[in-house]
Amino acid sequence: MAEEAEKHPDKPIEVWATDEHRLGLKPIHRRVWAPIGERPLALGHHRYEWLYVTAFVAPSRGETVWYLSNGLDKPFFAKLLEVFARETGAGRDRIIVLQLDNAGWHTPENLPVPDGIRLVYQPARTPELQPAEHLWPLVDQPLANKYFDTIDDLETVVAQRCCDLNFDRNLIAQHTGFHWWPKSVAPT
């Protein structure tokens, strides 16, 4: 952060995190309360079609940007970075330091990084350091113990959930705003 603040004293510096979550037609089962003697039903039929949710989060403010896709690879992630930078004003209005894990499509070789974005990789096998990991239980809530006929039905529910979470910045900040997470730096 200090390095970016030195390079760009006229722009705010923000720290964001990103991660991906794979959802499919394989049901998510959770415990539920039921009257004594009754067993709750949760339909399920394992099918292997996937929906990927990519989230970018600014934990200190609870701001999120969500993308849904049917797959992930390095060219697609590069395009996501480009769209994210454009939508958030990175480079033009602010500098974003983006923390991400070491997934294969995040590796720096041949990954074009847009102006205004600086990638910072977390240590290997440390998901507990990734604030975006804490978004997935929130995304999964409306999916638990539900049966979806098609991936489109699942996508509709997930898209609505992501929209709902966009408006609940306090909830996002509570789940992702670790006490040690760096705060934004205002321009000098």
Question: What annotation goes with each model-predicted range?
Answer:
Residues 1-188:
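Short functional hotspots at interaction and active-site rims
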